[in-house]
Amino acid sequence: MTATNHPKLFKRPVDGVLLLDKPGGMTSNEALQRVKRLFHAKKAGHTGSLDPLATGLLPICLGEATKFSQFLLEADKSYSVKGRLGVRTASGDSESPILTECPIPKLTKRALEKTLFAFRGVIDQTPSMYSALKHKGQPLYKLARQGIEVERKTRQVTIYELTLLDWDNESIELYVHCSKGTYIRTLLDDVGEALGCGAHVVALRRLRVAHYHEDQMIKLAHLEREYDKANYTGLDRYLLPLETMVSHFPAIKLSSSTAFYLQQGQAVMVPNAPTHGFVRLRDQNDQFIGIGEILSDARIAPRRLIQKR
């Protein structure tokens, strides 16, 4: 019997980050639940949904790692995306009804580059009705499936890099490095409109989240092959330490007394600390204990502290 169909599964406290290569045809929550069962984890969460059509990097946070998920939710992300030209759909991908079909103009690399140039930098996006954003507590995609459309506010996002990888008479492939909150389906839909023919996503792969990258990903099928119900900890070797989630923040080593007071919820003074922002907190044994924030009076306040097992 596998972990995915076991009726009464033993659950344990386990901490770490799994860089899952989400397969296509599966929701992010379905992938999360599969991983949670494989690791027999009491607590798990992911850091930003991928569409069912999409594949690629889906960081899964187990146990205490969930306390730091916001830092990955807010991080830059990178994708490769393939779009079909000449067809615009309701959701911006191939899994919804066609809205319009238009002839595709003769495209040159120069014309494509000129179009893409306009989408680099800070741009405004109007989220698709087929998104997880909520209107009066109801996800937009549920309203869209009922044929209901509501007004959505535009949002500013940043496209740091938008590179033409390939194109032919029917399709276009792009590399996108973008800020949090960017809808790739919306981006491709807007690019298609700018080209005068419309476009929609037929393949999407997330390559990077913050400093985590494609080469670090683990496939779900590999985890399922490696799973051993007699050894609950066997898959733990694939987990990354919690501290890797916040490695971009400077580290502060604390004395035993300072660490004690911080863990009691008190702000403390630390010599030679940075003047602002978040910091990684390490105790007198150089063990990661959480995240603190520099206050205006130069003290460090605890923000996310991990529970010692």
UniProtKB/Swiss-Prot annotation:
Query: Where along the sequence do coiled-coil regions lie?
Result: none
InterPro entries referenced in this protein's UniProt entry, alphabetically: PsdUridine_synth_cat_dom_sf, PsdUridine_synth_N, PUA-like_sf, PUA_sf, tRNA_psdUridine_synth_TruB, tRNA_sdUridine_synth_fam1_C, TruB_C
| Active-site annotation | 51
Catalytic activity, EC: 5.4.99.25
Taxonomically, the superkingdom here is Bacteria
Q: Which residues cross the membrane?
A: none
Record flagged with keyword tRNA processing: yes
> Entry's Gene3D superfamilies?
Pseudouridine synthase (3.30.2350.10), PUA domain (2.30.130.10)
Keyword terms: Isomerase, tRNA processing
Enzymatic reactions:
uridine(55) in tRNA = pseudouridine(55) in tRNA
BP-aspect Gene Ontology terms: mRNA pseudouridine synthesis; tRNA pseudouridine synthesis
* Pfam annotation, one family: TruB-C_2
* MF term (GO), any: RNA binding
Family the entry assigns:
Belongs to the pseudouridine synthase TruB family. Type 1 subfamily.
Function description: Responsible for synthesis of pseudouridine from uracil-55 in the psi GC loop of transfer RNAs.
The UniProt entry, under HAMAP family, shows: TruB_bact (MF_01080)
State the name under which the record lists this protein. Answer: tRNA pseudouridine synthase B
Give the originating organism: Coxiella burnetii (strain RSA 331 / Henzerling II)
